[in-house]
Amino acid sequence: MSLKIKDIKVKGYERVIHAINEITKLDCIIAIHNTKLGPSLGGVRSWEYNSFEDQKKDVLKLSEAMTLKNSICGINFGGGKAALNLKNAKKTPELYQSYGEVVEFLKGE
């Protein structure tokens, strides 16, 4: 399997992972900010990031915002978000299939 997943420690976040698939060109960071109200809920931003740090900064900001949005709405979900870097990839079914494998790896976190 060409999918590689690495945990990244970030203060104030429950879990942050970086996933790479060399075959599909997946370069994805998933950030789970807070699950005190329930499992994380958020979406996917597909963007051409100039650097890993830009991608990480964006996904951290977005996942924290999802925690706040879900709390304000009074729903029982925490905040999470994914950022896919499209700088070296095209939006293909294979790319998003490999992203789905990363989500499956988290088993509902």
Label each residue range with its predicted role.
Residues 1-109:
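N-terminal ligand-binding/catalytic initiation module
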